[in-house]
């Protein structure tokens, strides 16, 4: 959006503040319905950031896909689970939880040490894509594809891993 500097900064700060509050709500609220609505608020704030960064296509895709589909699916799934099941489960810690926690912590620490030490620009083909984008020979959708395959390759892969893990978790919960 072409906004004056102070208004742009105020919207960015407001969006960041609401994003932090929504993220804390997702983690700290005990009622799963409230937590799912907080997740929807977080996704809407992320879409606001995309709008402020003049990436309208990604912002609308964020709203339609994540808020309009995935978050609504999460809310429906939580609503179908009986509320008494949440309070009956008194077995809070099992061996599988401990093993999973160790694996996740190991992966996070290995990523934290690997990502800063890796020269991502040597791996990716950014020079060719930047030349094509600067010449203006392609449209916006092709620019998004080129940027996803070059500049934003790592975040794109991390998002795909997060979606895969959430899909596996949903299947596991559905089988129980």
Curated annotation (Swiss-Prot):
Signal peptide: none annotated. It is an enzyme of class 7 (translocase). InterPro entries: NAD(P)H-Q_Oxidoreduct_6, NADH_UbQ/plastoQ_OxRdtase_su6, Nuo/plastoQ_OxRdtase_6_NuoJ. Keywords: Chloroplast, Membrane, NAD, NADP, Plastid, Plastoquinone, Quinone, Thylakoid, Translocase, Transmembrane, Transmembrane helix, Transport. Its EC number is 7.1.1.-. The chain crosses the membrane at residues 10-30, 33-53, 60-80, 95-115, 152-172. Its main location: plastid. It is found in: Plastid, Chloroplast thylakoid membrane. GO terms for molecular function: NADH dehydrogenase (ubiquinone) activity; quinone binding. It catalyses: a plastoquinone + NADH + (n+1) H(+)(in) = a plastoquinol + NAD(+) + n H(+)(out); a plastoquinone + NADPH + (n+1) H(+)(in) = a plastoquinol + NADP(+) + n H(+)(out). It is a multi-pass membrane protein. The keyword Translocase applies. GO terms for cellular component: chloroplast thylakoid membrane. PANTHER family: NAD(P)H-QUINONE OXIDOREDUCTASE SUBUNIT 6, CHLOROPLASTIC. Belongs to the complex I subunit 6 family. NDH is composed of at least 16 different subunits, 5 of which are encoded in the nucleus. NDH shuttles electrons from NAD(P)H:plastoquinone, via FMN and iron-sulfur (Fe-S) centers, to quinones in the photosynthetic chain and possibly in a chloroplast respiratory chain. The immediate electron acceptor for the enzyme in this species is believed to be plastoquinone. Couples the redox reaction to proton translocation, and thus conserves the redox energy in a proton gradient. This is NAD(P)H-quinone oxidoreductase subunit 6, chloroplastic. The gene is ndhG.
